[in-house]
C-alpha cells in the first residue's frame, strides 16, 4: 500500500510544524494561498511588535532556517516542494510586508495579493529557478524572487502616490 506524502509528516515534529506553516499548508484547496494568508497575519503582527529593523533581521533568519526546514520536510515526504510546504510563502510575504509604507489594512491586502500574483504567475526567472533548483534553497528562492517582483510594484505604487 502506498502512503501519501502527508502521511510522512507530523505537526508534532517542530520542523514539520514550521515547514507546513503551523498547519496552514494542510488546508485545501490552494495551500500556498492559505500559507501566504497565515504568513501575512503573523508577519503583520511581528512587524507591528518588533519594528522594521528587527523584523528584517528575523526575516533573514527565517530564510536561512527555511532552507533547512523545507529540505528536511521535502526529504521526509519524499517529494520536492510539496504544496503543503509553505514556510517559503511565509518568508516571501514577510519580505513584501517590510516594503509597505504603513501597516494599514489596504497596504497589507496589496502586499498579500501582489505576492500571490507573482508566486502563482512565476515570471522569468522565477519559474526557471523553481524548476531547476532542487534543494531547500530552491524551494525558498522562487518565493523570494516573487517577493522582489511584488516589492518593485509596491515601490512604483508609492512613487505614484497611491493613497492607502
What spans do the regions from the language model cover?
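Active-site-proximal helix-loop elements at catalytic-domain edges
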Residues: 1-4, 102, 109-111
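Interhelical loop and helix-boundary elements at the membrane-water interface
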Residues: 2-36, 68-96, 117-148
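Hydrophobic alpha-helical transmembrane segments
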Residues: 18, 33-38, 53-60, 86, ...
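Interfacial segments of multi-pass membrane proteins
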Residues: 38-51, 95-100, 154
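Alpha-helical transmembrane segments of multi-pass membrane proteins
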Residues: 44, 59-68, 97, 111-120, ...
